[in-house]
Amino acid sequence: EFQEEIKEGVEEHKHEDDPEMTRLMVTEKQESKNFSKMAKSQSFSTRIEELGGSISFLTETGVTMIELPKTASEHDMDQLLHDILAAVESLGSTPR
């Protein structure tokens, strides 16, 4: 069930330029920028940076892009994904 939620709400891609990075994309509806606001204001960006990754916000398209190195532990990745999905759910956003 958890895997289904991940497929629904968060896309995971191998970074074309850098195969050592995993890219997560959270897409919001145009009128809703709640996730990106929350990701900027809470500890997400700090945690992502601590894992050696980066977070960027494409405000016109409503996409929040998170890149994490493959060196991040599976536990850290799972915890971060869990927190992202919980945040999306709590905001009532319908991720695409």
From Swiss-Prot:
Xref: InterPro entries: MIC5-like (IPR049098)
Keyword Cytoplasm: no
Signal peptide range in chain numbering: none
UniProtKB keywords: Glycoprotein
Disordered: annotated span: 1-20
Pfam families hit by this protein: MIC5
Glycosylation sites noted in the Swiss-Prot or TrEMBL record: 34
Name this protein carries in UniProt: Antigen H4
Taxonomic source organism: Toxoplasma gondii
